[in-house]
Amino acid sequence: MLHISRLGLFLALFAIVMHSVNLIKYTSDPLEAFKTVNRHNWSDEQREHFYDLRNLYTTFCQRNLSLDCFTQILTNVFSWNIRDLQCKSAVNLSPLQNLPRAETKIVLSSTAANKSIVASSFSLFYLLFATLSTYTADPPCVELLPFKILGTQLFDIKLTDESLQMAISKFSNSNLTRSLTPFTPEIFFNYTSFVYFLLYNTTSCIRSNDQYFEHSPKPINVTTSFGRAIVNFHSILTTTPSSTPSSTSASITSPHIPSTNTPTPEPSPVTKNFTELQTDTIKVTPNTPTITAQTTESIKKVVKRSDFPRPMYTPTDIPTLTIRRNATIKTEQNTENPTENPKSPPKPTNFENTTIRIPETFESTTVATNTTQKLESTTFATTIGIEEISDNIYSSPKNSIYLKSKSQQSTTKFTDTEHTTPILKFTTWQDAARTYMSHNTEVQNMTENFIKISLGETMGITPKEPTNPTQLLNVKNQTEYANETHSTEVQTVKTFKEDRFQRTTLKSSSEPPTVQTLSVTPKKKLPSNVTAKTEVQVTNNALPSSNSSHSITKVTEEPKQNRMSASTHGEINHTEIPRMTPILNAHTWEKSTTPQWPFTAETSLTTSSKSAILTWSNLLTTPKEPLTNTSLRSTNHITTQLTTSNRTQSAKLTKAHVSSQTTNIYPQTITERSTDVKKKSSTESREANKTLPGNDYRVTDKNSHNHPDNLTTKAYSTQNATHYTYNERHDLNNTDST
């Protein structure tokens, strides 16, 4: 037995050594080193960015790049250890601005702390493009690559046209460039390291960045993802145009050591990360990634959101999003693909990657479509429909929908191809507008003139009597502001966990108003000649007004128009998730005496199907859990309530009445009331505070320094419904608040 154990241990060690040797062995196949990682193990972020980057490369270079080559190169970059997350800069080059901003520390020396590179992943991708471009000797591609952005991202390098031309000249005449015929992993890493070094030494750099890269005439022992390599930048920069290939190879101190003599490299981050993600549950094809039916538990084993966190931004990174005055917008489906014309570079935009989490399944309200049926009316700011797109887009195991930017002429579409849930398409009408939402429900939107229209805050619903009054959301003192039969009636059948809300950080600016549109089309299609239209009148005054207009959506027949027809796709089955992830946040809290600037908007919802049934699953809803904070300002609020069953995970949308004042169906849907609103007694509030258990959710007016009115929301859950009541603190010198 002892002999067998020793033999087994020896064989195991031998296998490990041989595997390590294979990582850095020299071969005639230049891509062998990049063919060791399986794309099936990627997370949704990796899969998304892979196709984004591949499209970007083909847009710039118009070359047929090997899918395996691109896969393995990007896999290598994605797999490096992430030390920290931060937004390096605000360079706007779509779609690269949607990349996760991560810092990677590349150790250049194990003895000196300053022998290292701290580079953002944003820069590493540009570096890879530069490497691929110059290696393939494609001059147009090299000229088009944004080296200036690369330098800015990496070292705060201020590249001029002269310095850039000199760097490219040195780069093309260097020994390393001419020695790329044996495209080994060591040579590749030396090559990319040389790009960093060359850009750093041929331009004016900020002194504080010297720690990132230091010139050294001595060979540097470099730890790479493929093992260890030796870089001698002094010999690399020695240009010898008349040298022979043998002398060129000799000048590079990454020697061609036989694989049998190569020491065992240290375990690389690549091996570690992909061991954690090892699974066969995700099946991906090169052009149309899909996901097989699997359980939520298995998905969580594949992708952990903490493994690939979304970027975090500071308030200064997010510009304002305001509303255009007197804007008449007609929202239609846009079939334009921004990557159809590879010759035109991507249009820059300030939108960062946006994530909205939705429940797994939607079971929407069905409304017959005829000329007399009234549908939900949308008070404009954001328009929601439901859209199914089956295109070269990416699936999302975590039920995340990434709302990517759309310029005024093109739309970047992202969808969960395997889900039957609604699909979102993000549209902006101003390049300067940007919205960011992260997976941890933190978002920041700043607006001017107290305009606040939340993505889930502006739905006006046709009145509907409740079917079961006992299941309605109980709002304290509801009848006092149920003027003109505008009461809050929301049905719920799910008990939610009491998670803490995250407040929205508001910041004002002086940008002119603009319009943002969030559109989704329904799964069921209307005939192409049937259009649901909504014409609304909305003011930007945050205070409730008695003359606020309420619009009604009409379904009319129109001549057939060329609009997008969503295609069908497969389904994915999930088990019950532990909690319903919120969609959007309705959060209003501001005082304003700004004059009302009316604007109108026409929303067209056009679908096509054999059945004349419109399945309207509206994502402008208010779940009972904290929503992802997105804040704009308006006088109308959410009135559609999303509910879900704890067992079947079916989400139902029920209509509710809404007042033009305040819709207290969500703890953070709080708007300061004008003086003509009936005052809620302090005694009643104190009684409600004593009788209702739950968590405190506070929303503070950060702009009111002299009158800090703090509204405290009490929430508690029962078996069938979640009840909310409100408690407030009044300042006698301030306006009454609800």
From Swiss-Prot:
Keywords, alphabetical: Glycoprotein, Host cell membrane, Host membrane, Membrane, Signal, Virion
Post-translational modification (record): 120 kDa Glycoprotein O: A shorter mature protein, gO-80K, is produced probably by proteolytic cleavage. 120 kDa Glycoprotein O: Modified with high mannose-oligosaccharides.
Keyword Cell membrane: no
Annotated Low complexity bias: 240-263
InterPro entries with a match to the protein in the record: Roseolovirus_U47 (IPR008645)
GO cellular component: host cell plasma membrane; membrane; virion component
Region called Disordered, residue ranges: 240-272, 330-351, 541-568, 667-712
Glycosylation sites: 41, 64, 114, 175, 190, 201, 221, 273, 326, 353, 370, 445, 477, 483, 529, 547, 573, 629, 646, 689, 710, 720, 733
Biased composition (Basic and acidic residues): 673-689, 698-708
Signal peptide annotation: 1-23
Bias (Polar residues): 330-342, 541-554
Family, similarity comment: Belongs to the herpesviridae U47 family.
Name of the featured protein: 130 kDa Glycoprotein O
Record organism: Human herpesvirus 6B (strain Z29)
